[in-house]
From Swiss-Prot:
GO BP: any one term: nuclear-transcribed mRNA catabolic process
Protein known as: 5'-3' exoribonuclease 2 homolog
Pfam family name, one: XRN_M
Sorted UniProt keywords: Exonuclease, Hydrolase, Metal-binding, mRNA processing, Nuclease, Nucleus, Phosphoprotein, Transcription, Transcription regulation, Transcription termination, Zinc, Zinc-finger
Source organism of this protein record: Drosophila melanogaster
Subcellular localization, as worded in the UniProt entry: Nucleus
Region (Disordered): 409-457, 821-908
Family: Belongs to the 5'-3' exonuclease family. XRN2/RAT1 subfamily.
Positions annotated as zinc finger (CCHC-type): 263-280
Modified residues (Phosphoserine): S438
Length: 908
């Protein structure tokens, strides 16, 4: 989902959705490497999961070109990094039935336009960054600064190769094939489960291939409605896709969001400064001397669970509509909420100008939605179909508020700019003072020639920083002028005419054109909803504009046809490469085809501009802007490729074919004999329908199958061959349905909701929060003798003075912890990192039974992970729940005050 801010907004508004993953790992004292627990043991997170689905591109990208640590030296190291990441995720989730790995295949045209934009941007940014690095290096070297050697040109990894059809993706598929065999042959936790690999030759985005599998399985009569699903990926659309399944037990696992992660300077590889502030090696770069990152440098990334069952609880409260004149259905309202989120942003359509997630766009739409439901006595969507009459009402109300939305936005932006400008001036003035002191100190050096050299070097570095500071100060006003160069000015009258003239190059007042854009946008909304609920409605439809219309342009949309052409097919992998790659990435396409991207006489040379404009469109950063690239005409593209198909090598022809999913079963599986029999059939075209463990599909023979007791060679140097193989491989296809079949968006019979986490009106003060997944953990109890020991220990720490007590508790920190004087109590938690959410679960009894959350050391009255509940204002007990590991360590603390209330301990 094209909304980077969506997850941050969601985690702030609905914080109890997030919990930290528990891995039960140890660190090897000699090597410093992590030692993870045997995944055959019970899951330390208090729940056993059935199926783990990996959206592999979210793993491949950070493993091949990480932003916060040195990149792998070669492809072999990249593959090993991918293996290690899969192992770690497998160890956290510990699936007991299925592991499904899905790599992005060829995407629908609607998505290809975004992919094309990303890849052209990546090539442009790489070129510009190289030039900027060369310029800065030359400037620093001319001033005598010391620099590390330049990277060799061959060391650069082109991330654009992570696209279906490239040699890299073909090799990745072979390596994953080896990886699955290795784990099923050597790791007991893998031997009893099914593994499905959907590589880049299988059409479809990774997450949507996964959703197609889930959708088709749950439509089968023997599907378990209480299957525990875990989907790994960082895209916000995974949350929407999970909600769209209506499965009661659906969890997302993703990397913990850490803002301000330290990144090394591209010039000197140091931390604490950007490359434009670099002064080379040996000198103290600005802020680096006192650089204290929010996240420790080189810290291992942590994973979190996003519990969609808890999000459903929140949305039940958010979407509640009492006294409706018809029977209320939360499942229908949930589908409508998913649909409304598409207006804020998605990967297929630009967001409406009046809707910004940071401005409460979703809340605004929910308010308009409820008004619509009461008025029309019905919902917006039904299993992927849209009621345009009701959408028209919401768009009309939103359009009436557009003018005020734009004016309010401008006021906030002006206030922010004023504060930001004042902050920058203050920081640079402070910088100037420290630089003068540094320069003065550097001149007070003794007569030794070496010392004079060091002193002169420091003086030169200080002078260089001073010049940069002066230049920065002079550029402040220039930046303001650039930011104010907005020819549309949405906050002023006449913004519509200016918008369409500037963005679409059409004459002011051309109402017919505006209506046409709005109708295409509505068709796009219908296509996206079908994509989420039924699968791809059309492989060749796309929104043919770079910008969205205004909400007020949605007029008379009720009669628009929402049907799409049937029987469309995706591009082949190599054809897609020609549609999304810039000329700078031509090394990844067949050589005869690559000439079409650079030859001035090429009939499609206009598809590959060397330079293009990025319209900031009111944003601050280039990556937020709109890349104004020409849309690819697929008929022209295919026609231009016709003369070159017979020049493809055998390997390239193979990479250009659509493939099948692969199923892997070891001889420890109860279904081994059945699958082995299919794998040994003489005819590869013969397929057999299967049903086991609630999974249905069709299996077929594949040439990739390695004979039982045979040998599979390792494709990676340094890794062992698989000898005496015990794994069987077949092709796997999902159950087939008619093209007109409708997958109903509903709860299945016998589906059981997990224990409720949030309190409701009926629970009152009796509500007992559910920590993590397990609601049946033994409640801790402290006897009277324990209370006496606690009281005595706390009094000893306080030393008889003041009311301050703090501590680490029993399980962590050793003993009772260290007393803190005065009236301050300190819970055992690490607030050194500036999170959007805090995962330490600290529960205190709080008046009113509500919850208090800390965001970046702020307290907000919402339900959250740093949840504190107090029985009254004077209650002093705090219960720390850390290290969620089966029977939980319970750390009791005394916080402030001098009285102990033993009866409150007994409540736990």
């Amino acid at each position: 989902m094209g909304v980077p801010a969506f997850f941050r907004w969601l985690s702030r508004k609905y914080p109890s959705v997030i919990i930290e993953c528990n891995e039960n790992k140890q660190v090897d004292a000699d090597t410093g490497r992590n030692i993870y627990e045997d995944p055959t043991l019970p899951n330390p997170n208090g729940i056993e999961f059935d199926n783990l689905y990996l959206d592999m591109n979210g793993i491949i990208h950070p493993c091949t070109h990480p932003e916060d640590k040195p990149a792998p030296k070669n492809e072999d190291e990249m593959m090993v990094a991918i293996f290690e990441c899969i192992d770690r995720l497998f160890g956290i989730v510990r699936p007991r039935k299925l592991l499904y790995m899905a790599i992005d295949g060829v995407a629908p045209r609607a998505k290809m336009n975004q992919q094309r934009s990303r890849r052209f941007r990546a090539a442009k940014e790489t070129t510009e960054k190289r030039l900027e690095i060369a310029r800065i290096r030359e400037e620093l070297l001319s001033r005598g600064c010391k620099l590390p050697p330049e990277k060799e040109k061959g060391e650069h990894f082109d991330s654009n190769c992570i696209t279906p059809g490239t040699p890299f993706m073909d090799r990745l598929s072979k390596c994953l094939h080896y990886f699955v065999h290795d784990r099923q042959n050597n790791n007991p936790a893998w031997k009893g489960i099914k593994v499905i690999l959907s590589d880049a030759n299988v059409p479809g985005e990774g997450e949507h291939k996964i959703m197609d599998y889930i959708r088709k399985q749950r439509a089968q009569p023997d599907h378990d409605p209480n299957t525990q699903h875990v989907l790994c990926g960082a895209d916000a659309d995974l949350i929407m896709l999970g909600l769209a399944t209506h499965e009661p037990n659906f969890t997302i696992i993703r990397e913990e969001f850490l803002p301000n992660k330290p990144r090394p300077c591209d010039i000197c590889n140091g931390f604490g400064h950007e490359m434009d502030k670099c002064v080379g090696l040996g000198a103290t770069a600005p802020t680096s001397a006192n650089f204290k990152p929010d996240v420790p440098i080189g810290a291992e990334v942590k994973f979190i669970f996003v519990r969609l069952s808890v999000l459903r609880e929140y949305l039940k409260q958010t979407l509640e509509m009492p006294n409706l004149p018809f029977e209320y259905s939360f499942e229908r309202a949930l589908d409508d909420w998913v649909f409304m989120c598409f207006f804020v942003g998605n990967d297929f359509l630009p967001h409406l100008p009046s809707l910004e997630i940071r401005e409460g766009a979703v809340d605004r739409l929910v308010e308009l939605y409820k008004k619509c439901v009461y008025k029309t006595r019905g919902y917006l969507t039904d299993s992927g179909d849209v009621n345009l009459d009701r959408v028209q009402l919401i768009m009309t109300d939103l359009g009436n508020a557009e003018d005020q939305i734009f004016k309010s936005r401008q006021r906030r932006e002006e206030q922010f700019k004023a504060r930001d400008k004042a902050r920058k001036r203050q920081e640079r003035n402070q910088d100037h003072g420290s630089l003068n002191q540094s320069a003065f100190g550097a001149s007070a050096v003794g007569p030794n020639s070496q010392q004079r050299s060091v002193g002169n070097y420091k003086e030169e570095a200080a002078a260089l920083r001073n010049r940069k500071r002066t230049s920065d100060m002079a550029n402040l006003d220039d930046e303001d002028e650039e930011e104010n160069n907005d020819e549309v000015r949405l906050w002023e009258d006449g913004f519509k005419d200016r918008y369409y003239e500037s963005k679409f190059d059409v004459a002011p007042g051309n109402q017919q054109f505006r209506y046409a854009v709005a109708l295409q946008y509505v068709r796009g909304l219908c296509w996206v909803l079908k994509y989420y609920y039924q699968g791809c409605a059309s492989w060749n439809w796309y929104f043919p504009y770079h910008y969205a219309p205004f909400a007020s342009d949605f007029v008379n949309i009720q009669g628009l046809s929402t049907m799409f052409e049937k029987g469309t097919k995706p591009f082949n992998p190599l054809e897609q490469l020609m549609g999304v790659f810039p000329a700078a990435s031509s090394s990844h396409v067949p050589e005869p085809w690559a000439k079409l991207m650079s030859d001035p006489e090429s009939p499609i040379i206009d598809f590959y501009p060397e330079d293009f404009k990025i319209d900031l469109n009111g944003k601050k950063f280039a990556w937020q802007g709109v890349a104004l690239l020409p849309f690819v005409d697929e008929k022209r593209l295919f026609k231009a490729l016709v003369p070159y198909y017979d020049q493809l090598t055998g390997e390239e022809v193979k990479r250009n074919k659509r493939g099948d999913n692969y199923l892997y079963i070891s001889n420890q599986s109860p279904h081994y004999k059945k699958v082995k029999k299919i794998s040994e059939k003489d005819d590869e075209s013969v397929c057999k329908a299967i049903s086991f463990d609630g999974m249905r599909g069709t299996l077929g023979k594949t040439e990739l199958n390695t004979a039982i007791s045979g040998v599979l060679k390792s494709p990676i140097s340094g890794l062992s061959d698989i000898n005496d193989n015990i794994t069987v491989t077949t092709t796997f296809r999902d159950p087939e349905y008619d093209e007109d079949y409708i997958f109903e968006a509903k709860r299945l019979e016998n589906a059981v909701d997990p224990p409720q986490v949030l309190p409701n009106e009926q629970s009152g003060n009796k509500h007992r929060p559910v920590i993590g997944f397990n609601s049946h953990l033994t409640r801790a109890y402290v006897p009277d003798s324990g209370h006496r020991m606690l009281n005595a220990g706390i009094r000893n720490q306080q030393g008889g003075g003041g009311n301050g007590g703090g501590g680490g508790g029993y399980g962590q920190g050793g003993g009772y912890g260290q007393g803190i004087g005065g009236n301050q109590g300190q819970s055992y938690q690490n607030n050194s990192r500036n999170y959007n959410y805090n995962y330490n679960n600290n529960y205190n009894q709080h008046q009113g039974g509500g919850y208090q959350n800390n965001y970046n050391n702020r307290q907000q009255q919402q339900y959250g992970h740093n949840q504190r509940f107090n029985q009254d204002n004077s209650n002093q007990q705090q219960r720390n729940f850390n290290n969620y590991n089966g029977p939980r360590n319970n750390n009791y603390q005394q916080q402030g005050g001098s009285r102990q209330q033993n009866q409150n301990y007994r409540r736990f």
